[in-house]
Amino acid sequence: MRDLRSDLKELYRALSQTPATEGGRTVMFMSARSGEGVSSVATAFALLAAEQARKPVWLIDLDLKRNHLFNTFAVGPFADAFGGVGPPYSASLKTQPFFSVEPELPEATQGLGLFTAHRVGETRLMVTQFDASRLKAGHGIRIKT
C-alpha cells in the first residue's frame, strides 16, 4: 500500500468546503475490481482528513472478513509510521448494525463487540475491525441495503 496523501490534498480541500450534515461528512471510495488501489486511496484520504479535522475520522473497511485496512495499521510500515492500533471501542454508535450475520448468531452475542473501532497511534484516525473469529463454519456476513 502506498501513501497517497500528497496526491489527494486538492480533493480533500474541495470536499472540506462543502457543508457538512449534522453528523459530519461521509466519503466513500469504491472500485470495480480488486487491485485498483482503492484501499490506498481511502487510507491516504482518511489520514489526510485526520491531520486536518477537529473531530475523529473513521476508516471503515466493508470487506469485513479480511479487515485489510485494520491490518495495515496493526502491523508493518503503516503501523511503524503511525503508532499501531489501540484498544477496541464499540463501533455500534448505539444504532442498528449496517451488517447482518447469517444464519443469525445467538441473541446474546449478535452484534456485541463484533464491530470495533481502534485509534491509530496518537492521530485522530479510527480504523474498524470485524471480529470474524466469532463466526462459525457456515456463517456469512452481509452488508444491509
Report the location of each language-model feature.
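Gly/Ala-rich phosphate-binding loop of Rossmann-like dinucleotide-binding domains
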Residues: 46, 50-51
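P-loop/Walker-type NTP enzyme "switch/lid" segment
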Residues: 2-5, 9, 13, 20, ...
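Hydrophobic positions on the alpha1 helix immediately C-terminal to the Walker A/P-loop
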Residues: 41
